[in-house]
Amino acid sequence: MAQKTLLIITDGIGYRKDSDHNAFFHAKKPTYDLMFKTLPYSLIDTHGLSVGLPKGQMGNSEVGHMCIGAGRVLYQDLVRISLSLQNDELKNNPAFLNTIQKSHVVHLMGLMSDGGVHSHIEHFIALALECEKSHKKVCLHLITDGRDVAPKSALTYLKQMQNICNENIQIATISGRFYAMDRDNRFERIELAYNSLMGLNHTPLSPSEYIQSQYDKNITDEFIIPACFKNYCGMQDDESFIFINFRNDRAREIVSALGQKEFNSFKRQAFKKLHIATMTPYDNSFPYPVLFPKESVQNTLAEVVSQHNLTQSHIAETEKYAHVTFFINGGVETPFKNENRVLIQSPKVTTYDLKPEMSAKGVTLAVLEQMRLGTDLIIVNFANGDMVGHTGNFEASIKAVEAVDACLGEILSLAKELDYAMLLTSDHGNCERMKDENQNPLTNHTAGSVYCFVLGNGVKSIKNGALNNIASSVLKLMGIKAPATMDEPLF
């Protein structure tokens, strides 16, 4: 069976029986139509307990790629941290205690929602209450979501935060995630969020009034303009700061702005000393204490391929590059032996519905080049279904699917010509459901199944399964015995 193999991840394209508001169903997709007729396919679970998340929790790109690469179910940070907090272990957490003991004032910042992709509001509340038990003054810096949850749900989450506020816990600032959680080096966005932390951009309104004023201007949660509230005078030297997001990719830039001595992305008010801690490891170069260090993941797909002295190439555009490198390799930043990485720049647009094809063509050209070079394993992510789906724009999401389909057609044709095997699946769904039951735009991921197609010598049928079955399936196509730590293949 041994073949050179393609692992294609069509981000955000999921399975849904209903056709209403289903961008995948309504797209013209001759390549998918061909695969449905000629290739064995099945359905793959991407959410909840199947990927180490709480029951019913929607999957996401980080969790999905980690599970794909590991070939087994991993307890994700959300579950691990929640269990720790439920067991009252925070009072014995050395990184947490050391950080809050260094100052009377503790700043907590993070995404205020229960989306569970980057953070969870229960973690936010638990840390604030634990700080209060230690007689600290707690400043809450709220980042509104509107992307992993409904676009106008911030007031609901705000009430939960206000329920714990008192003379010791106060809401200091607010910012839409578009500004405070950029990951594409758009530091003009980070600067606005940073300035609010410094006590600039004051509003006389209360937090709830300010959110409503943004809604009145047709600004939804994701894009709420950073502001700080009365009685907040800004962060001061020698105070403590904890960023409560457990996912790292959208936390790095704001933490860099706060803590890095050498920082030139914008002119800032710098600190002599700020006692920073992060929920999980955000970057290997960061010297900050970590409340929940990563658990080591051994024998990932990329590592096993490297151990067999085979070549591999990981390809994606900017928005998903971390997912096909750091996350799919089990949280390992450094490439393995014989691992090549190709980064295609994502288009510089405000939102991707303005360019639904994104950089899929550039990604495809890189894949075709690696195939012609004879690379043994090619892992590629197409970001369109997810990134355009997040905008809530149905017509643009249809175009996104059509762009991916055209690219898949080129890849599938060359795969057959060069005798490449192929496994195509998604890390989670998104664009197959673009409106909720009330006909409001749905911008978050779906908690459902995705397709899995296989092109391989002798493969006539494949079983239903989950993302933890992908790595062993890829290794089987390559003629490599999967390690005992991996779950069974799909065929």
Swiss-Prot record:
Binding site for Mn(2+) 1: D386, H390, H445
Cofactor comment text: Binds 2 manganese ions per subunit.
Organism: Helicobacter pylori (strain J99 / ATCC 700824) (Campylobacter pylori J99)
GO terms, molecular function: manganese ion binding; phosphoglycerate mutase activity
GO cellular component labels: cytosol
Residues engaged in binding Mn(2+) 2: D11, S61, D427, H428
Gene from which this protein is expressed: gpmI
Family to which this protein belongs: Belongs to the BPG-independent phosphoglycerate mutase family.
Short name of any one Pfam family annotated for the protein: Metalloenzyme
Domain of life: Bacteria
Names of the cofactor(s): Mn(2+)
Classification via HAMAP family: GpmI
Protein name in UniProt: 2,3-bisphosphoglycerate-independent phosphoglycerate mutase
UniProt keyword Manganese present: yes
Subunit structure: Monomer.
Entry keywords, A to Z: Glycolysis, Isomerase, Manganese, Metal-binding
GO-annotated biological processes: glucose catabolic process; glycolytic process
Pathway: Carbohydrate degradation; glycolysis; pyruvate from D-glyceraldehyde 3-phosphate: step 3/5
Function statement: Catalyzes the interconversion of 2-phosphoglycerate and 3-phosphoglycerate.
